Amino acid sequence: MVLSTVNLTLIEELAAQALALEDLTPEQGLLLLQCDDPGGWEVIRQYGDRLRRKLVGETVTYVVNRNINFTNICEQHCNFCAFRRDDGQTGAYWLTDSEIFNKTKGAVAQGATEICLQGGLNPQAKINGSSLAYYVNLVETIKGQFPQLHLHGFSPQEIQFIARQDGLTYGEVLMALKFSGLDSLPGTAAEVLVDRVRRIICPEKIDSQTWLEIIGLAHRHGLPTTSTLMAGHVETPEEIITHLDRLRQRQQTSLAQGYAASITEFILLPFVGEKAPPSLRKRVGRDQPDLDQALQIMAIARLYLGKWIVNHQPSWVKLGLTGATTALEWGCNDLGGTLMEEHITTMAGAKGGTCLTATQLQNAIISTGRPYQQRTTLYEHLNANLNKIGLK
């Protein structure tokens, strides 16, 4: 149905409530997300953009980083994943310490301030029978030679995997990795934090509560995390709002408890199905992300997460640089990283590419009439690449 004038008025009232930094209820968030009127969506877009401006200003940030997926050998079989391989299967790989070191060295030569380190769950990845020892060695391989780098690594799923392999608590794993030099965790493996969805797309992964528990423990132990949502597959609008609500509650709890760290950003990861396993690909019915849907979710995320998670980032790997740049008008304030390489999404059939230069990111930002700023992983500004162009 087409929303009536009264309902359009309600849309604006709710968006204005979010702009006033008053938290939306799940019911209110769902009402916004289910808007089916172009005029209503323009209101939501405008308010998302205004809230972005209020919380973080006009400057668009980016980070110079390198993504290292150290292995695609994985014991799990997620129904959306085209990256994983069994050991010995065609296309399987496992980087050596030397290869990881050389990739890091190359990244530093290109000005990287961050290495993002993630991989498949490989039961053979052990040193002297210990999974934790292997992961500690990964951290030390990088931080031992490049202590200035921020090491952003290991999702909650990887933390659970290490703990399960070695019979340790999550806290013990997190503390050992932090002591070795790990600086923060990516909030990947969240997918959708609703177990009905997880049973369909990733039945072997940790459940929603475990993901949230590990994120909270990371914060408690002083390790910042990001947060993500993979949308555009089998989830419902209600489940998108539930996911956002659980992220917001997790952040509120970490801040209320006075933990030394918290969630630094929210990233939408639209589903890419071109090379995904056939069952889910057929069920979803399209191979590439729906840009309009992604933009709408990003605007809703900005309004719903409000003052609690203020940095919002689109995925240029999934949406392409043009799509990601458009997201800067829908509540986003960051364009992410240069990456230098990326395998997980690319192997799923994404068309956005695997590497962008800082200049390409800067030019995309300039095209919006907003200034750019190079940042660190934790959103501290780096003065080397500050652009003070006039705003439109």
UniProtKB/Swiss-Prot annotation:
Its EC number is 2.5.1.147. Binds 1 [4Fe-4S] cluster. The cluster is coordinated with 3 cysteines and an exchangeable S-adenosyl-L-methionine. Pathway: Cofactor biosynthesis; coenzyme F0 biosynthesis. PROSITE patterns: RADICAL_SAM. Residues 60-307 form the Radical SAM core domain. It catalyses: 5-amino-6-(D-ribitylamino)uracil + L-tyrosine + S-adenosyl-L-methionine = 5-amino-5-(4-hydroxybenzyl)-6-(D-ribitylimino)-5,6-dihydrouracil + 2-iminoacetate + 5'-deoxyadenosine + L-methionine + H(+). Consists of two subunits, CofG and CofH. This is 5-amino-6-(D-ribitylamino)uracil--L-tyrosine 4-hydroxyphenyl transferase. It comes from Synechocystis sp. (strain ATCC 27184 / PCC 6803 / Kazusa). The gene is cofH.
